[in-house]
Amino acid sequence: MTNINRPMTALEWALLVLLSLLWGGSFFFIGVAVKEIPPLTLVTLRVSLAAAILLLILRSLGLALPREARVWRGFLIMGLLNNAIPFSLIVWGQSHIPSGLAAVFNATTPLWAVLLAHVVTENEKLTLARLAGLLSGLAGVAAMIGPAALRGLGTDVWAQAAIVLAAISYACAGLYGRRFAAWGVPPMATAGGQVIGSSILLTPLALIIDQPWHLPLPSMHTIAAVLGLAGISTAMGYTLYFRILATAGTTNLQLVTFLIPPSAMLMGVLWLDESVSASQWLGLALIGFGLACIDGRLLRYFKVAR
């Protein structure tokens, strides 16, 4: 069994940063598309189009999805844990609480991942340095979003609980998804199977609740945003997700939640000419310190230096 209580390699860190950029971009795509498309229909389009894209890529590479019943049961469970449940809870929760507060609750995903992994796995045990790093990263996310993110804390408790449950669902998905590598399923095939499973679960709900055939035809920029959300953030994103999960483990994978705010900040500076506030610099420093604690190499360097 792979030892996952090791520092991540440079390649794994690079893939994690790339994943944070892909998922950070999803907020832009969603912000454009949700103005014309209801949330449930948008989520269904996201996973359905991603499934079609991944199937085309798999076929062009001469690869096929596995046929074993246990693998397809796994795809359905991953679709439930990683898409259907958290997407629905987050959409509902964000309709009742500020998006900044929702982002802070969503950033608890790595905490739940490390606690659950400590209980149910043999090779992802909790250490003091890892716990300190996770708490520092969570504080960094809160600082980057700003003090306004914590307004409303303690009100709309059910909505806040929904976001926390979504974070727990993501953490459970990371643990459950480890088995696909053991079954010999390639990351791209696992990503394709998961979004197919999500599509099977979500399509009937979208048809019943939103009745999308009554919706007006979306504009071209909305269609482009949906394609970006499906192709870049979802198809490419989940392929990377399962690639990282196979070698770096659940806890390390969920660190992407801490990297998304800095990635979004970087994109804003480079492409939108946005400025960086003092609280964002503080948050960036806390996240960097937290990631260094979790990685462990910097702490070992100072120990040796002493």
Residue ranges and their predicted role:
Residues M1-T44, W92, G152-R179, I200-L202, ...:
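Glycine-/small-residue-enriched transmembrane alpha-helix faces in small-molecule transporters
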Residues M8-W13, K35-L40, T44, R67-R73, ...:
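Juxtamembrane helix-entry segments on the extracytoplasmic side of multipass membrane proteins
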Residues L22-I30, L55-N106, A143, A230-A248:
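Specific transmembrane alpha-helical segments of multi-pass solute transporters/efflux pumps
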Residues S26, L49-I53, F105-V119, L135, ...:
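Alpha-helical transmembrane segments of compact multi-pass small-molecule transporters, enriched
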Residues L54, A113-L115, V119, A143-M144, ...:
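Transmembrane alpha-helical segments that form core, pore/gating elements
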